[in-house]
Amino acid sequence: MSDLDEEYQLDYFHEEGFERKECPSCGAHFWTRDSERDICGEPPCADYDFIGDPGFDTEYSLEEMREAFLSFFEDHDHERIEPYPVAANRWRDDVLLTQASIYDFQPLVTSGETPPPANPLTISQPCIRMQDIDNVGKTGRHTMAFEMMAHHAFNAREDIDDPDQYAYEGEVYWKSETVAYCDQLLDELGADIEDVTYIEDPWVGGGNAGPAIEVIYRGLELATLVFMCMEQDPDGDYELKDGNRYSYMDTYVVDTGYGLERWTWMSQGTPTVYEAVYPEMISFLKDNAGLDYSDREESLVNRAARLSGKLDIDDVDDVEAARDDIADELGVETDELRALVEPLEDIYAIADHCRTLAYMLGDGIVPSNVGTGYLARMVLRRTKRLADGVGVDAPLDELVDMQAERLDYENRDTVRDIVRTEVEKYRETLERGRRHVERLAEEYAQKGDPIPLDEVIELYDSRGIQPETVEEIAADHGADVEIPDDFYSLVAERHGEADADADDGTLAGDDDRIADLPETEKLYYEEPERTDFEAVVLDVIERDADGETVYDVALDQTMFYPEGGGQPADTGTLSTDDVAAEVTDVQETNGVVLHRTDEAPGKGEFVRGQIDGVRRRRLMQHHTATHIVGHAARQVLGDHVRQAGAQKGVESARFDIRHYERISREEVKRIERVANNIVTDNLPVKQEWPKRNEAEADYGFDIYQGGIPPGETLRLIQVGEDVQACAGTHVLQTGDIGTIKILSTERVQDGVERLVFAAGDAAIEATQRTEDALYDTAEVLDVSPQEVPATAERFFEEWKDRGKRIEELKEQLAEARAHGGDGGEEVDLGGTTAVVQRVDGDMDDLRATANALVEDGTVAVLGSGDDSATFVVAVPDNVDINAGAVVGELADRVGGGGGGPPDFAQGGGPDVDSLDEALDAAPEILRSMLEA
């Protein structure tokens, strides 16, 4: 028996007459009431046998099934709580997307650090599992977007030494009760509980583990019951399936997952889950794509659906071989089966992906090249590719809106705008990337090698070219490429984790002396405008910084703000009767604030601290202004706008936001007006210190715009309607900011816009600098400041006209040179003519002359000696001369190099004196190439 076998000997199983058996097909152990049953009941050991014969008494819609589940657990003393967003990185910094309901409570609740919102609780949590993307459509049961109905109970062992160390105590319920709830729910819905099997499948993940049970009914996994009670421990008593050892924790958690879509499917018995979940959309897509089956074909498709569970890429090594087996079982050719089911599989995937996009974009994810934005873009482009391939011509934004409407999102207009913008970007990406793929295909075709998978993934990552496009282009150029069935899962896995925590930037690191010090009392929160204080020196640590001796001073209390949250540290002085130390930096580590000084006060001495008041005030103004500008941006641009980064300075601040397009000048002015209205309203800047659960319940997860602070208690800053978890210093009233001026915007990366602004005196100074530049320009142009724009536009148009005229004259000169007007040597090459000529001009002159010659069917060999020796060689299509090779030989004669494609190349070298000699050798070089 395995280490956890005893964990499955539940009182409920024995009381209800279950038997424990081993599946002869897969070897899994399972519990059943049916003494005659041999197999576990899960595909591929069994087929779906509820298709056309629903497994429940009543047919349910998604909404009805969700309500039936939640009401059942409410009737059994669970509190219903609202679902969290699908973007888990809005309240966690270790993951990107919500993949299970337990994500809502990790790691703080599951570890016992903070209490759950209710105990026990029930929830129906929208989730997205990118790793299932390649299975969607094929297996009949996989959906990338789904709702995990769940009930959770958080328990702590009663025999631990210090029960107060955890936010909950005692046992609510455990394994037997959990299985009993599931069994009773199935029974109430009319399931034949004799046909239900409970498969033992220990769970490991994220350093935790425990026994788990898969609930299988008529070939379909309906639920997983996880009992999280162990943690990874090299000295643990239990070795589990991942090869690691585990020991029991003081806390233990009931973590269940009931797939809403699958329960709904079971109640309806449709051919696949997709007809049960998206009936209207599937019908629309089939009509739009012109999919129409005869009665025989419809029957064949439905029979294939019963067997589609065998196409799970996680269970089979070769999906196409599995499809061959299904075709054999159905008595048809694989090609006929594929022609019928593959378009339908694409339709299913489109519907699912549109729902996934509705969740992502509706919850404020903005497509980009990183994080959740990357994943959203990947799904969107795959959906567009599938739609084009199967012949769906309805605009993608309309398809996504169908799902957003059903999910009842209020920001549907923004969602549609984002989709339209992304579709256009995708079209441009394909146009730019096609030539690159063609060159790559030609390269590997010449080698006789297939294009490697790493190259295909890199093409997708860096250029957005999907593998199917690579496959098509490669075939046109005689190159092979093998695309694995789980390609998109592999790509998603690369981008599915949040970035690791960055260095905390502390001065002292893990210094043992710091660890022994008490936390510093922070005075700046209660009196942010005060700049002087007194304190006791607790410790002074001498350090070497680039050859200079500096000191880290720890005090019992401080007014100095340590660097953090994008706000620089305060500066100032620490003084005693004997020492006046300059404070140049302040950092915090483990609650201890360290003041970097150039001199050392004595340990145990009283010191007088003096903050640089002007610097502190400007930093406070810019920090509060950052909150205001962020709120104003959301008011103007939409609720999807979220902070992507911020840095407050003395002269200005920058605020990065996630937004799908460039911010227009008119939008900048509107943001500025909204922000300054908040300033002139002179609103109080409030702070409070609620428990984390209370803060999230009252204000949602947008409080974490600036990052996710640790601990059970949060500091919240409220400015009007805007509420943020924030540890920075702020003004007391918005009127203390004075004014806010947005200085510039820029696109710092795809999907991220940067707003640079100044507040207070810094805003006035920035405005004056801009005015100075305007007045200086007006003086140079000899016009009034008001006339500068029109004058600049007139000069620009004149400059463009003159540039065009210069180009025309250059072309005329090139034509004259090309037709013998400038002393070029004509060389007879036997069937074609070459012109070898020195043209002392810039590279544009050389290219223009070469192009003119080639258009007349003449080989051009041109040289210039302005600053260095430069060559351009151009060859007509029908001439067997390699321009790159010619340039290489010429450039070698002037001490340089060069090359290029066979039809046009350039190069050169530093030896100008050898230019004419090199050109004299050109005729012989050309003839030797033709003879070769």
Curated annotation (Swiss-Prot):
Cofactor binding notes: Binds 1 zinc ion per subunit.
InterPro entries, sorted: aa-tRNA-synth_II/BPL/LPL (IPR045864), Ala-tRNA-lgiase_IIc (IPR002318), Ala-tRNA-ligase_IIc_anticod-bd (IPR018162), Ala-tRNA-synth_IIc_core (IPR018165), Ala-tRNA-synth_IIc_N (IPR018164), Ala-tRNA_lgiase_arc (IPR022429), Ala-tRNA_ligase (IPR050058), DHHA1_dom (IPR003156)
Enzyme's top EC category: ligase
Entry keyword set: Aminoacyl-tRNA synthetase, ATP-binding, Cytoplasm, Ligase, Metal-binding, Nucleotide-binding, Protein biosynthesis, RNA-binding, tRNA-binding, Zinc
One Pfam family it belongs to: tRNA-synt_2c
Cofactors (names): Zn(2+)
Keyword Thylakoid found: no
GO biological process: alanyl-tRNA aminoacylation
UniProt catalytic activity: tRNA(Ala) + L-alanine + ATP = L-alanyl-tRNA(Ala) + AMP + diphosphate
Composition-biased stretches (Gly residues): 894-910
Region feature (Disordered): 893-916
Similarity comment: family membership: Belongs to the class-II aminoacyl-tRNA synthetase family.
HAMAP family attached to this UniProt entry: Ala_tRNA_synth_A
Domain notes: Consists of three domains; the N-terminal catalytic domain, the editing domain and the C-terminal C-Ala domain. The editing domain removes incorrectly charged amino acids, while the C-Ala domain, along with tRNA(Ala), serves as a bridge to cooperatively bring together the editing and aminoacylation centers thus stimulating deacylation of misacylated tRNAs.
Entry protein name: Alanine--tRNA ligase
Gene name in the database record: alaS
